[in-house]
Amino acid sequence: MTMFNKIVKEFQWGQHTVRMETGEIARQASGAVIVDVEDTVVLATVVAAKSPKAGQDFFPLTVDYIEKTYAAGKIPGGFFKREGRPSENETLTSRLIDRPLRPLFPEGFYNDVQVVIHVLSINPEIPADIPALIASSAALAVSGIPFNGPVGAARVGYKDGQYLLNPTRAQIAASDLDLVVAGTERAVLMVESEAHQLSEDVMLGAVVYGHEQMQIAINAIHDLVREGGKPEWDWAPAPKNEALIAKVSEIGLPLLQQAYQLRQKSARSTKLKEIYATVQAQLAEAGVEADKVEVGNVLFDLEAKIVRGQILAGEPRIDGRDTRTVRPIEIRSSVLPRAHGSALFTRGETQALVVATLGTKSDEQIIDALAGEYRDRFMLHYNMPPFATGETGRVGSPKRREIGHGRLAKRALIPVLPKDDEFAYTIRLVSEITESNGSSSMASVCGGCLALMDAGVPVKAHVAGVAMGLILEGNKFAVLTDILGDEDHLGDMDFKVAGTDAGITALQMDIKVQGITKEIMQVALAQAREGRMHILGAMQGAMGHARTELSAHAPRMITMKIHPDKIREVIGKGGSTIQALTKETGTTIDIQEDGTITIASTSTDGMAEAKRRIEGITAEAEVGKIYAGTVLKLLDFGAIVNILPGKDGLLHISEIVNERVKDIKDWLKEGQQVRVKLIQADEKGRLRLSLKAALAEEGGSISPIAQGDAPAAAPAAPASPDQQQ
């Protein structure tokens, strides 16, 4: 007899075996499901408040995806040895899970819902995001909370003309596509992808393929609910106050229709605030008791009805455009005098100032991920301060939205970046959104590409991005190019497409309704290509190609190779040699384990000097070669002479001159410069030198110290450069 009512479902999903269970762990949560995909194990829990907070006018869903270091057999770093603030990957995965779940909660359901996902075990080859999304959907499904799911999800790769279902990390690295799609049995709700300039048909095919394959997971969730699901909540939306709706419509509809004739955002926003206040005041005068939140919801529905109706009727959009027109574009490059690269990209009332900075390998971001530590040479940071929308607000660390928008823009640009061996710089792009009225992430893509080109980064092609919208009513639909912020809020689909002339590099899609077909998506993608090509034309006209020279303020770099065994000599004891080198030459020096050395500096002379000194430190002494040496120490039987950095040899007393030498001090002194020939090197690295052999070969001479003030070898023909090492 067990105290648990444990339900387990197993199914084969592509190349992976999936195990899904509920009823044993986290039983006090509204719903809890563990999903195990070949040792990647996640626990998703859901808890919902029994009633909404007073005055609540939105659905308060929170999703927290948490990676535990013990999942990979690690102990956290730092002083406290605990997991700290969410990593960028945790934030992005939380958003990935939130986006397909949120539209499926019924309208009017305002109870707090919290979804928490813990990664308990990680197989480095199996990413945890798809298991986490499946587990979250299953936990909601078994909880009985009002939810129009379940949701399925799949990752799709593309290689050699074939789609790959839930590829491993190794397969993703070799794939031309990394696409995540989520949806219900009937409809796609969310797409997130990065691609290597693939066509619209290939991208749409991947979405359809992923939706077909996720049905296996959806069916397994249905089976789990049948055996282990909790009773469904007895919940119904609050009845609509038809009398209030009629009164608010009577007062507000004509005013709102007038407001939406204003084409400028700030004027329209000001007018809308006035209308909301006017409606509240007139209701109070009429003695109508009404909750402010309820009135606001009615007015919002009226706004949506006006905007959607105008567009579906073929009337101009909010700002006067038709459905296909892109807003006016203005581009300016080299905006900031000391930055390595910069561009100001303005499209209508959306504006991004994007700045590129070049650095060395030591500037790479080191990411301590669960699957293993790695380095990232390309960073893109997106910031949108409140003034961009004419508002006041908090300024500080980036919010989830900013991290997500930055990641989307980064995905769009990665496929056109040069490889490390072609352009060894670390690159950081910062997109400062200075104005926003829709599509700021796509403005970051356009401005980011131009800033890279302004910095002299040899990108493979121009990349442009455009945000698209869709309005669907029954069998009628309209696709909108380059949407405004209001069109985003009032529409049924928001999708962003970025790419080059050759194809798509990033696609993000969020769908709020379940009636969007493959044919509608096909029309939308074709119209998005039209908009993208228009923007690419404007960008190519403003900057046809990347600058051939870097900014005067950017570091220059040279690369050299040494034997890995010599690395320790370049670094020196406790780093003394490398520290002295960087300080004295004004350079930054990075040394890789394979012996690759990168020297960076704004000074060409400093780089050349650092390279010369490293070559000297790592040079191998060659038997038969003549070197310019320095006498370091006199011995009874000879002298120690330095011929290369870290390379000392013995000049025996018999190898100074042909005649017999009674006292070495008669011929040499410490600090004296002499030319010596390396005549022997044994297996232990001990070197034997000869001064007389060098004199004979070069035709020089040396005099005893007692007979002259300059006891050095007589001038001879200059040695070749390799002898001067």
UniProtKB/Swiss-Prot annotation:
Q: Which keywords has UniProt assigned to this entry? A: Cytoplasm, Magnesium, Metal-binding, Nucleotidyltransferase, RNA-binding, Transferase
- What EC number(s) does this enzyme carry? 2.7.7.8
Q: Which residues form the KH domain?
A: 555-614
Q: Which residues bind Mg(2+)?
A: 488, 494
Q: From the Swiss-Prot or TrEMBL record, what is one GO molecular function term?
A: magnesium ion binding
Give me the ranges of the annotated region Disordered. Answer: 702-725
Instruction: Please provide the Gene Ontology terms (biological process) for this protein.
Output: mRNA catabolic process; RNA processing
Name any GO cellular component annotation.
cytosol
Source species, domain of life: Bacteria
Question: Could you tell me which PROSITE patterns the record lists for this protein?
Answer: KH_TYPE_1 (PS50084), S1 (PS50126)
Cofactors needed by this protein, per the record, are:
Mg(2+)
Provide the S1 motif domain boundaries: 624-692
Low complexity: bias regions: 706-725
Cell location: Cytoplasm
Catalysis: reaction(s): RNA(n+1) + phosphate = RNA(n) + a ribonucleoside 5'-diphosphate
Q: Which family does it belong to?
A: Belongs to the polyribonucleotide nucleotidyltransferase family.
Q: What does this protein do?
A: Involved in mRNA degradation. Catalyzes the phosphorolysis of single-stranded polyribonucleotides processively in the 3'- to 5'-direction.
Q: What is this protein called?
A: Polyribonucleotide nucleotidyltransferase
Q: Which organism is it from?
A: Cupriavidus metallidurans (strain ATCC 43123 / DSM 2839 / NBRC 102507 / CH34)
Q: What is the lineage of its organism?
A: Bacteria, Pseudomonadati, Pseudomonadota, Betaproteobacteria, Burkholderiales
